[in-house]
Amino acid sequence: MFTEGTFDGRITANLASALSRPVEEVRKAYFAKVEELELGRWGLDTFWEWIQQQLPGAGLASSEFRRIFLSSVQENAAMYDLLPRLPDSVELGLLSNNYPELSTLLRADPRWSRFRALIFSNELGHKKPAEQAFLALLRGLGCPAEHCLFVDDVLENLEAAAALGFQVLQYREHQTFTAGLTELGLL
Protein backbone atom coordinates (compact mmCIF):
# COMPACT_ATOMS: atom_id res chain seq x y z
CA MET A 1 0.00 0.00 0.00
CA PHE A 2 2.93 2.32 0.58
CA THR A 3 4.27 1.39 -2.85
CA GLU A 4 2.63 1.77 -6.24
CA GLY A 5 1.88 -1.46 -8.05
CA THR A 6 3.90 -4.51 -7.19
CA PHE A 7 7.53 -4.11 -6.23
CA ASP A 8 8.34 -7.63 -7.40
CA GLY A 9 6.84 -6.95 -10.82
CA ARG A 10 8.87 -3.77 -11.17
CA ILE A 11 12.18 -5.25 -9.99
CA THR A 12 11.86 -8.23 -12.33
CA ALA A 13 10.99 -5.97 -15.28
CA ASN A 14 13.90 -3.64 -14.47
CA LEU A 15 16.26 -6.56 -14.04
CA ALA A 16 15.12 -8.17 -17.31
CA SER A 17 15.79 -4.89 -19.08
CA ALA A 18 19.27 -4.55 -17.55
CA LEU A 19 20.12 -8.14 -18.48
CA SER A 20 18.47 -8.01 -21.94
CA ARG A 21 16.59 -11.17 -20.97
CA PRO A 22 12.90 -12.06 -21.31
CA VAL A 23 11.01 -10.90 -18.24
CA GLU A 24 9.35 -14.33 -17.89
CA GLU A 25 12.77 -15.95 -17.59
CA VAL A 26 13.86 -13.46 -14.92
CA ARG A 27 10.58 -13.82 -13.02
CA LYS A 28 10.88 -17.60 -12.98
CA ALA A 29 14.29 -17.38 -11.30
CA TYR A 30 13.28 -14.51 -9.00
CA PHE A 31 10.04 -15.97 -7.71
CA ALA A 32 11.53 -19.42 -7.18
CA LYS A 33 13.56 -18.12 -4.22
CA VAL A 34 12.29 -14.65 -3.26
CA GLU A 35 10.78 -16.15 -0.12
CA GLU A 36 14.34 -16.68 1.12
CA LEU A 37 14.64 -12.87 1.18
CA GLU A 38 11.19 -12.34 2.68
CA LEU A 39 11.99 -14.69 5.55
CA GLY A 40 15.45 -13.25 6.11
CA ARG A 41 17.29 -16.45 5.26
CA TRP A 42 19.25 -14.78 2.46
CA GLY A 43 20.61 -11.31 1.89
CA LEU A 44 20.66 -9.57 -1.48
CA ASP A 45 24.12 -10.87 -2.39
CA THR A 46 23.13 -14.52 -1.89
CA PHE A 47 19.87 -13.96 -3.74
CA TRP A 48 21.72 -12.39 -6.67
CA GLU A 49 24.24 -15.25 -6.75
CA TRP A 50 21.36 -17.73 -6.97
CA ILE A 51 19.64 -15.77 -9.75
CA GLN A 52 22.90 -15.67 -11.71
CA GLN A 53 23.14 -19.47 -11.42
CA GLN A 54 19.66 -19.72 -12.94
CA LEU A 55 20.42 -17.21 -15.68
CA PRO A 56 23.82 -18.13 -17.13
CA GLY A 57 25.60 -15.13 -18.55
CA ALA A 58 23.83 -12.66 -16.26
CA GLY A 59 27.04 -10.71 -15.77
CA LEU A 60 25.76 -7.90 -13.61
CA ALA A 61 27.85 -6.86 -10.61
CA SER A 62 26.24 -7.41 -7.23
CA SER A 63 26.36 -3.64 -6.60
CA GLU A 64 24.40 -3.00 -9.80
CA PHE A 65 21.81 -5.63 -8.84
CA ARG A 66 21.46 -3.92 -5.45
CA ARG A 67 21.02 -0.52 -7.13
CA ILE A 68 18.33 -1.87 -9.47
CA PHE A 69 16.63 -3.70 -6.62
CA LEU A 70 16.50 -0.72 -4.26
CA SER A 71 15.60 1.79 -6.98
CA SER A 72 12.58 -0.29 -8.01
CA VAL A 73 10.58 0.98 -5.04
CA GLN A 74 7.91 3.40 -6.24
CA GLU A 75 6.23 5.12 -3.32
CA ASN A 76 2.48 5.61 -3.09
CA ALA A 77 2.60 9.33 -2.24
CA ALA A 78 -1.08 9.38 -1.26
CA MET A 79 -0.41 6.96 1.60
CA TYR A 80 2.51 9.00 2.88
CA ASP A 81 0.38 12.15 2.66
CA LEU A 82 -2.32 10.40 4.69
CA LEU A 83 -0.11 9.59 7.70
CA PRO A 84 -0.03 13.11 9.23
CA ARG A 85 -3.79 13.46 8.68
CA LEU A 86 -4.58 10.55 10.98
CA PRO A 87 -5.51 11.65 14.51
CA ASP A 88 -2.82 11.23 17.17
CA SER A 89 -5.20 8.87 18.98
CA VAL A 90 -4.78 6.36 16.14
CA GLU A 91 -1.78 4.17 16.89
CA LEU A 92 -0.11 2.67 13.86
CA GLY A 93 1.67 -0.58 13.23
CA LEU A 94 3.11 -2.02 10.05
CA LEU A 95 3.29 -5.69 9.13
CA SER A 96 5.18 -6.04 5.87
CA ASN A 97 6.47 -8.93 3.83
CA ASN A 98 9.78 -7.26 3.13
CA TYR A 99 13.40 -7.75 2.23
CA PRO A 100 16.78 -7.10 3.84
CA GLU A 101 18.09 -3.62 3.09
CA LEU A 102 14.62 -2.32 2.18
CA SER A 103 13.44 -2.79 5.75
CA THR A 104 16.60 -1.03 6.97
CA LEU A 105 15.85 1.93 4.67
CA LEU A 106 12.26 2.09 5.91
CA ARG A 107 13.32 2.11 9.56
CA ALA A 108 15.65 5.04 8.83
CA ASP A 109 12.92 7.07 7.07
CA PRO A 110 11.52 9.71 9.48
CA ARG A 111 8.04 9.33 7.97
CA TRP A 112 7.82 5.95 9.71
CA SER A 113 8.45 7.43 13.17
CA ARG A 114 4.68 7.64 13.69
CA PHE A 115 4.48 3.82 13.76
CA ARG A 116 4.50 2.17 17.16
CA ALA A 117 5.44 -1.20 15.67
CA LEU A 118 7.35 -2.00 12.48
CA ILE A 119 7.26 -5.75 11.86
CA PHE A 120 9.15 -6.97 8.80
CA SER A 121 8.98 -10.57 7.64
CA ASN A 122 12.70 -10.71 6.87
CA GLU A 123 13.50 -9.81 10.48
CA LEU A 124 10.78 -11.98 12.04
CA GLY A 125 11.20 -15.12 9.94
CA HIS A 126 7.45 -15.32 9.27
CA LYS A 127 5.38 -13.54 6.65
CA LYS A 128 1.73 -12.73 6.08
CA PRO A 129 -0.58 -14.59 6.15
CA ALA A 130 1.13 -16.72 8.84
CA GLU A 131 -0.46 -16.37 12.26
CA GLN A 132 2.97 -15.77 13.84
CA ALA A 133 3.35 -12.58 11.81
CA PHE A 134 0.05 -11.16 13.05
CA LEU A 135 0.81 -12.15 16.64
CA ALA A 136 4.14 -10.31 16.41
CA LEU A 137 2.27 -7.21 15.26
CA LEU A 138 -0.12 -7.46 18.20
CA ARG A 139 2.80 -7.82 20.62
CA GLY A 140 4.42 -4.75 19.08
CA LEU A 141 1.24 -2.73 19.40
CA GLY A 142 0.41 -4.05 22.85
CA CYS A 143 -3.29 -4.46 22.18
CA PRO A 144 -5.73 -7.24 21.29
CA ALA A 145 -6.77 -7.89 17.70
CA GLU A 146 -10.32 -6.76 18.46
CA HIS A 147 -9.00 -3.21 18.96
CA CYS A 148 -7.07 -3.18 15.68
CA LEU A 149 -7.95 -2.39 12.09
CA PHE A 150 -5.79 -4.36 9.67
CA VAL A 151 -5.42 -2.85 6.20
CA ASP A 152 -3.95 -4.75 3.27
CA ASP A 153 -4.36 -5.08 -0.48
CA VAL A 154 -4.19 -8.90 -0.47
CA LEU A 155 -7.40 -10.76 0.31
CA GLU A 156 -5.58 -13.78 1.76
CA ASN A 157 -3.90 -11.53 4.35
CA LEU A 158 -7.20 -9.87 5.25
CA GLU A 159 -8.87 -13.24 5.74
CA ALA A 160 -6.05 -14.40 8.03
CA ALA A 161 -6.29 -11.19 10.08
CA ALA A 162 -10.07 -11.44 10.35
CA ALA A 163 -9.76 -15.04 11.56
CA LEU A 164 -7.64 -13.72 14.45
CA GLY A 165 -10.22 -11.08 15.38
CA PHE A 166 -8.91 -8.00 13.57
CA GLN A 167 -11.30 -5.62 11.88
CA VAL A 168 -10.18 -5.45 8.26
CA LEU A 169 -10.26 -2.96 5.41
CA GLN A 170 -9.00 -3.74 1.93
CA TYR A 171 -6.84 -1.18 0.15
CA ARG A 172 -7.68 -1.13 -3.55
CA GLU A 173 -7.93 2.49 -4.56
CA HIS A 174 -6.96 5.44 -2.36
CA GLN A 175 -10.21 7.45 -2.45
CA THR A 176 -12.28 4.41 -1.54
CA PHE A 177 -9.82 3.58 1.22
CA THR A 178 -9.96 7.05 2.77
CA ALA A 179 -13.76 6.95 2.52
CA GLY A 180 -13.63 3.69 4.49
CA LEU A 181 -11.42 5.30 7.13
CA THR A 182 -13.81 8.25 7.36
CA GLU A 183 -16.75 5.88 7.74
CA LEU A 184 -14.92 4.21 10.64
CA GLY A 185 -14.30 7.61 12.26
CA LEU A 186 -10.54 7.46 11.75
CA LEU A 187 -10.28 10.53 9.50
Residue spans for each PLM region:
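Active-site neighborhood of HAD-like aspartate-dependent phosphohydrolases
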Residues: 1-29, 163
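Alpha-helical elements of Rossmann-like donor-binding domains used by nucleotide-donor carbohydrate transfer enzymes
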Residues: 10-14, 32, 46, 50, ...
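Short, acidic loop-to-helix structural element flanking the phosphoryl-transfer center
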Residues: 60-93, 131
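Asp-based, Mg2+/Mn2+-dependent phosphohydrolase catalytic module
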Residues: 99-187
